[in-house]
């Protein structure tokens, strides 16, 4: 049994650990409902690069700390000019270029807007009894993404 922590975002916004061939990635901004800022996007991208690169890793699991999976984009960070998209992998370091190996979204609590996009970019979803999904931007006629319903 192997278990090791890997460094990710310097701020601790993304936590990464390995356990028995599984890369466990935690979005760690519970006070902000795990909203995606620049550090989260970069941290997830680095974690998924590690998943693709390391042969002993077979699968990734992505989840959120606290009571929400992910509330979507951090609008304060976006308004402050933070780069929310990773140049290689897109929004949240995942949406435009998911990893080659399977990625499971472990959802408990809310997955809203961009958080729901993250779920859709994963290969599999496991949802707890408290999982809730939504696209609140639709009510405001805001749609900035084209959904990919099939994987390549």
Language model features: what each stretch is:
Residues 1-65:
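Conserved CoA-thioester-binding segment of acyl-CoA-metabolizing enzymes
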Residues 25, 62, 74, 118-120:
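Hydrophobic/aromatic residues within transmembrane alpha-helices
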Residues 32, 64-99, 111, 139-141:
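Glycine- (often His-adjacent) and acidic-residue-rich active-site loop
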Residues 38-39, 73, 117, 147:
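Generic recognition of short, well-ordered alpha-helical segments
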Residues 90-98, 106, 112-152:
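CoA-thioester-processing core
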């Amino acid at each position: 049994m192997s278990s090791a922590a890997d460094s990710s975002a310097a701020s601790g916004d993304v936590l990464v650990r390995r356990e028995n061939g599984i890369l466990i990635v935690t979005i760690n901004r519970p006070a902000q409902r795990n909203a995606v800022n620049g550090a989260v996007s970069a941290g997830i991208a680095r974690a998924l690069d590690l998943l693709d690169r390391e042969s002993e890793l077979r699968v990734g699991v992505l989840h959120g700390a606290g009571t929400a999976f992910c509330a979507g984009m951090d609008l304060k960070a976006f308004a402050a000019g933070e780069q929310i998209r990773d140049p290689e992998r897109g929004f949240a370091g995942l949406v435009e270029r998911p990893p080659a190996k399977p990625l499971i979204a472990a959802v408990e609590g809310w997955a809203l807007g961009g958080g729901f996009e993250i779920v859709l970019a994963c290969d599999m979803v496991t949802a707890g009894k408290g999982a809730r999904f939504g696209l609140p931007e639709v009510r405001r006629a805001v749609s900035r993404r084209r959904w990919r319903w099939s994987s390549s």
